[in-house]
Amino acid sequence: HFVRYGLVPKREQRPGVDAAELGTLYHEAAERFTHAVTALPEFPEVSVEVCDKLMDEAVSPLIDAWRESPMGESRRGEAVARRIRRTAKRTARNIVSQYADSSFRPMQMEFVFGQNGLSPIVLELGNGTFVYLQGRIDRVDVMTGGGLRVIDYKSGSRKFDPTLVYWGLQLQLLLYLAAALARVPGSHAAGFFYCR
């Protein structure tokens, strides 16, 4: 209590690119882009040029805000900003491709569970203890017939590894899918994916 409220520690600001900050930027850009692109009458048949334009409109204000930081003003910051823009445009094309190649349509961005009065995922451990999980799923898509898929945006290189799932070391996507299924009556599992 004393440390948290008396000393009020803050994270040290070190020069360099903060991966968590960039991850948040990518998430926000992907969410803004998805809202914009799915509102188009021609969606999901959207050209690369339109994808790039919409993502540029989504990511530019975020990059501008980031560039106001000491890191963003440096030469390295300029290079990082160019990389952010390139990666964001690639992500935009991937998002549209996911919809164009399937019968899925977006159901909800930032799908919350275990917060704001919504039920958490409840797990009972072997010793009888309960664990209550809460979270926020980047995107949930639905297809005709009630199939749900969850999408988690990743800016890093993480890939799905069934061996890690088997050993209980990579359960995030499975838990997200369980949370979505619990909140949507009559739905069934249709998949879970990382999107870069």
Annotate the PLM regions.
Residues 107-181:
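Non-catalytic protein-protein interaction segments used by genome-maintenance enzymes to assemble
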Residues 29-119:
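A non-catalytic, helix-rich entry segment at domain boundaries
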Residues 36, 40, 97-103, 128, ...:
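Secondary-structure transition/capping motifs at alpha-helix termini
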Residues 18-25, 47-59, 76, 80-87, ...:
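Secondary-structure capping and boundary motifs in well-ordered enzyme cores
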Residues 4-8, 31-35, 39, 156-159, ...:
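Short, well-ordered loop/turn and helix-capping segments at boundaries between secondary-structure elements
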Residues 1-7, 57-64, 141-155:
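Active-site-adjacent bridging/hinge elements
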Residues 1-36, 130:
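C-terminal, charged and often intrinsically disordered regions of DNA end-processing helicases
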Residues 42-46, 50, 111-114, 177-196:
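Substrate-binding beta-hairpin/strand module that engages nucleic acids
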